[in-house]
């Protein structure tokens, strides 16, 4: 349970740049925890996205081909099933419209905490997530 699962984000046939930011954060966290980085992409054209995600620092890429555009139910089920199969220490999801749609559902199904708007991850002494607060 030291691996990190990163969920890639795409829109209109393009992998979004935030996906690479998430992979970098996931790699740093996995290194601190002594684990691997698993990337996943759900939706259309997943083979092309998988090639783009299969870069240095990514140990495995998992795909779920389903439609062309985002589907809440499919993404929620896919990420939940992958979490149950891999049992990672953390799941890193995009803070995008789609990510904020399915992330709470995944957390609820798995009975796990969810931190949105995270600005930092640290695995040196357990798992610490930093989130800015305003007020």
Feature roles, as predicted:
Residues 1-135:
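N-terminal glycine-rich FAD/FM-binding segment characteristic of electron-transfer flavoproteins
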């Amino acid at each position: 349970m030291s691996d990190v699962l990163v969920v890639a984000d795409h829109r209109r046939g393009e992998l979004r740049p935030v996906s690479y930011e998430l992979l970098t954060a996931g790699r740093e966290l996995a290194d601190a925890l002594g684990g691997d980085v698993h990337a996943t992409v759900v939706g259309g054209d997943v083979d092309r996205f998988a090639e783009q995600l299969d870069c240095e620092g990514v140990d495995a890429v998992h795909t779920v081909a389903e439609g062309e555009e985002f589907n809440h139910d499919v993404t929620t089920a896919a990420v939940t099933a992958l979490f149950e199969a891999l049992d990672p220490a953390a799941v890193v999801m995009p803070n995008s419209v789609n990510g904020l749609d399915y992330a709470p559902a995944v957390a609820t199904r798995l009975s796990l905490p969810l931190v949105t708007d995270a600005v930092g991850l640290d695995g040196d002494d357990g798992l610490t997530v930093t989130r800015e607060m305003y007020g």
